[in-house]
UniProtKB/Swiss-Prot annotation:
GO molecular function, one term: structural constituent of ribosome
Organism: Jasminum nudiflorum (Winter jasmine)
One family name in Pfam for this protein: Ribosomal_L33
Keyword Cytoplasm part of the UniProt annotation: no
Gene Ontology CC terms, in alphabetical order: chloroplast; ribonucleoprotein complex; ribosome
Family (UniProt): Belongs to the bacterial ribosomal protein bL33 family.
Listed PROSITE patterns: RIBOSOMAL_L33
Name of this chain's protein: Large ribosomal subunit protein bL33c
Highest taxon of the lineage: Eukaryota
């Protein structure tokens, strides 16, 4: 089956909510992953390790500008 425009799996970028909220000057932790739009229609939020905060934080999905 060909992957077209309506492919259920899309790439998403997860960004640390703690770094964004606290305006950390060192940087912002980002992860790239995939999600299935049919199973997860809402924005994705995962607990992942942030090297700038030095602990596990919630990383939320951000919008990709193309």
């Amino acid at each position: 089956m060909a992957k077209g425009k309506d492919a259920p799996r899309v790439r998403v970028i997860l960004e640390c909510t703690g770094c964004v909220r606290n305006a950390v000057s060192r940087g912002v932790s980002r992860y790239i992953t995939q999600k299935n739009r049919h199973n997860t229609s809402k924005q994705l939020e995962l607990r992942k390790f942030c090297p700038y905060c030095h602990k596990h934080m919630i990383h939320g999905e951000i919008k990709i500008n193309k």
